[in-house]
Amino acid sequence: MSNFVRLIFDWSEVWALLIPLFAFLLGKRQHALLKPVIVYLWLALVLNLSEVIIAEFKIIYHFPAWLQSNNPIYNIHSIVRFACFSYFFISLPQSSFKWLKLGIALIFVLFSVVNFTYFDVFFNAQSFSGNLLTAEAFLLLIYCMLYYLYALNDEDDVMSKGPVFWIVTGLGMYVVINFFVYLFYVVMLAQNPTLTTNIWTVHNIAYIIFCLFITRALYATIRN
């Protein structure tokens, strides 16, 4: 892979977010249900920009010791993403599975506490928490499946035909693609760092696709 293409992918977690944010800024109004997604986009932009700046410039500009690793930011990003999309799914006007959705959110909180108490170190400079990101992807996938299950059982559900559909579909694709990336990332990092770097490109491609689906959702609100 050429240096130019590598540079594009290295910064993809930043510029990909600018696409849906641009669509958001163009719109005069957005559906209230999309507010958690908009909040996520802005927070993700700050977090991802911080991640890339640390990765690209920590050596050149001699960042202090506590800024020599961006892995803790990935842990923060995982928690932020789950919190925003958990709120998004719980807020959907779908009466079924309400308590189950709340239970999923509680499971994530309990898992995170146990994980960082007994298994992982939150501020680990060597790697982000594969356990955390894997659990996040799995639970978000359950949210997506519950959404589709409700939509299949209710043909009149307007949420299955608008911007919410595009967001859930994009999120579902993102977590399905990256579940195994997160699951085996820490092991691969220890055994073959070069392969791990190449596999992370798959994550970046999935993230670009995810952002394009969000853009499609926001564009739909602009047209309407």
Q: PLM features: what roles do these ranges have?
A:
Residues M1-N224:
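Terminal, non-globular segments
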